[in-house]
């Protein structure tokens, strides 16, 4: 009689390894009171010395069919601790499906109301979240060094519109694309005489001229490469605003009583909208009617400029395709906080005062931006959001949930000094 014996060797470098699977359903009732009824607002008007009256107008349309938003989520996670606690972290992958999505729907100006709240469709979110914490030095000759990294990525997709259509261009909604996207022309430069397509300028841009904004042409060409039509609304592109990934990195270094903490944040890819450069902004209105900052606009001697030449083809008060000037790469890596502190050793004078511990620290918030294409060009903080993450539609096709930098107060650099006492 023979037998087989197995022996499981312990893996000493693994302390904890845990798998998690979860499923849940939640609802979102983030609807203000009386949204289903609609609202009236007052508007005073003066018809003369004795003709002051107050009128009423519809400020919000009623929606009797407004309902809750529902989300179902699958989570798959891994928790680990390695090397006797020196390294730990989590990894989580999720799939979330949302039905009856609550969004503010933009309406034509002729309706008299800018928007109303509705259940507009279904979305799907897939992504991951990863955190890693490590102790690089653990009181080695008095030195301690710790670091932490968090990383996340999300892919959003609109899977269905309640109307049954494939798109809603007025609200920038397109089935199969992220719900946060813009529908506009894609700027590829400025028209210059050395451009291979300049010979077709009269076809692509009837009445156009050198120095105006050039946008991407998506139409057909004949055998010789000649465009078959002018650039028009059919050339607008669906441009996603989602970043490829985002996260943060922090580190702490301590030596004896001193400690230094640095917290950073980063974002890779995606788009932000600058209302300073967008349509009706302050930097693209070069008609001499407003005082301007120093603008890099096109001239025959400056053909590599960013902005079109003044006095070119206008669209209202803006240069044609002026909205394309407001789209920027939203990538950045910035330092959010630096704190330097000192923990005093327990001494007789502290004991006499009844103080058990004493710590002094100096902290600076938003000290500097390490790298950012938007900051390099404008000097502005790419993380500042003029509107916040509100689900409210606004003019010019910019939704308040979009990352938008505008004329609101910029982020400030703050210096703090503090003392922590424990009695």
Model-identified regions with their sequence ranges:
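Transmembrane beta-strands of outer-membrane beta-barrel pores
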Residues: 23-29, 93-99, 134-136, 151-157, ...
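Outer-membrane beta-barrel signature, preferentially recognizing the C-terminal barrel domain
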Residues: 46-88, 116-140, 176-184, 240-245, ...
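C-terminal beta-signal and terminal closure region of outer-membrane beta-barrel proteins
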Residues: 120-127, 171-196, 297-303, 320, ...
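Solvent-exposed loop/turn elements at secondary-structure boundaries
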Residues: 10-69, 88-123, 162, 166-168, ...
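Extracytoplasmic gating/loop element in the C-terminal half of outer-membrane beta-barrel translocons
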Residues: 267-359, 363-365, 386
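Short, small-residue-biased leader/transition segments that mark boundaries at the very start
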Residues: 2-9
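Conserved small-residue
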Residues: 118, 124, 137-241, 281, ...
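Transmembrane beta-strands of outer-membrane beta-barrel proteins
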Residues: 15-21, 76, 87-89, 145-147, ...
């Amino acid at each position: 009689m023979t037998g087989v014996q197995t022996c499981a060797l312990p893996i000493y470098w693994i302390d904890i390894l845990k798998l998690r699977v979860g499923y849940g359903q939640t609802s979102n009732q983030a609807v203000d009171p009386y949204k289903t009824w609609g609202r009236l607002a007052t508007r005073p008007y003066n018809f003369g010395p004795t003709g002051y009256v107050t009128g009423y107008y519809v400020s919000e349309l009623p929606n009797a069919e407004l309902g809750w938003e529902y989300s179902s989520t699958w989570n798959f996670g891994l928790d680990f601790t390695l090397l006797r606690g020196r390294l730990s972290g989590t990894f989580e992958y999720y799939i979330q499906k949302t039905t009856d999505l609550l969004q503010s729907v933009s309406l034509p100006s002729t309706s008299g109301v800018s928007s109303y709240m509705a259940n507009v469709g279904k979305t799907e979110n897939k992504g991951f979240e990863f955190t890693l914490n490590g102790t690089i030095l653990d009181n080695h000759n008095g030195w301690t060094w710790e670091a932490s990294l968090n990383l996340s990525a999300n892919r959003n997709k609109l899977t269905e519109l309640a109307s049954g259509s494939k798109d809603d261009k007025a609200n920038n909604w397109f089935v199969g694309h992220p719900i946060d996207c813009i529908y506009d022309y894609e700027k590829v430069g400025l028209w210059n005489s050395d451009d291979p397509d300049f010979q077709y300028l009269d076809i692509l841009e009837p009445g156009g001229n050198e120095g105006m904004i050039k946008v991407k042409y998506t139409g057909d060409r004949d055998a010789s490469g000649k465009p078959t039509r002018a650039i028009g609304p059919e050339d607008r592109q669906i441009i996603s605003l989602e970043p490829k990934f985002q996260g943060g990195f922090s580190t702490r270094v301590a030596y004896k009583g001193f400690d230094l903490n640095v917290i950073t944040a980063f974002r890779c890819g995606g788009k932000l909208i600058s209302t300073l450069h967008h349509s009706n902004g302050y930097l693209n209105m070069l008609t001499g009617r407003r005082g301007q900052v120093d603008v890099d606009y096109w001239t025959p001697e400056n053909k590599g400029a960013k902005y079109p030449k003044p006095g070119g083809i206008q669209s209202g008060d803006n240069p044609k395709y002026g909205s394309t000037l407001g789209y920027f790469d939203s990538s950045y890596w910035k330092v959010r906080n630096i704190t330097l502190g000192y923990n005093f050793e327990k001494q007789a004078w502290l004991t006499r005062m009844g103080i058990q511990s004493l710590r002094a620290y100096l902290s600076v918030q938003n000290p500097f931006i390490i790298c950012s294409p938007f900051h390099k060009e404008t000097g502005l903080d790419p993380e500042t959001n003029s509107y916040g993450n509100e689900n409210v539609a606004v003019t010019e096709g910019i939704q308040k949930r979009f990352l938008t930098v505008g004329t609101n107060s910029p982020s400030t650099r703050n210096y703090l000094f503090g003392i922590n006492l424990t009695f």
